[in-house]
């Protein structure tokens, strides 16, 4: 959400400003999503396609859940604190000093997102193979950085 404000004493300039920005806004924000919107409209017209979409969505939900379950169990086992997690794309690891921990992990080619008060792990983008053992690596980096969670 945003606003575009034009200030002028000329009605012609104000009208041109409005027309240009209507066109630009539609071209910038409406068109990129229109293909996806039309695709969803076509899918929802066909019960078979809806069933396939639901099955695919359930498959990805389960895949992310399995990854998160692995990480949460391993985090509990090694004493790495995490924020409560029910479902979703991200798990948050609370701490102050996340930049230091993430920098250390990057040296091992582990790329997490440092936040002001923690680290965000995208369980949606890390394979099960790579998520296994990750909690212990994060915990080791936290301990090496002398950070108290």
Task: Give the residues covered by each predicted segment.
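Active-site lining segments that contact anionic ligands and/or coordinate catalytic metals
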Residues: 1, 86-90, 107, 116-118
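Active-site PLP attachment segment
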Residues: 1-16
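Short, well-ordered loop/turn and helix-capping segments at boundaries between secondary-structure elements
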Residues: 7-8, 45-49, 140, 144
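Structural signature of PLP-dependent enzymes
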Residues: 15-37, 42-72
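Conserved PLP-binding catalytic core of the aspartate aminotransferase-like
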Residues: 53-105, 125
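PLP-dependent enzyme catalytic core of the Aspartate aminotransferase-like
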Residues: 99-149
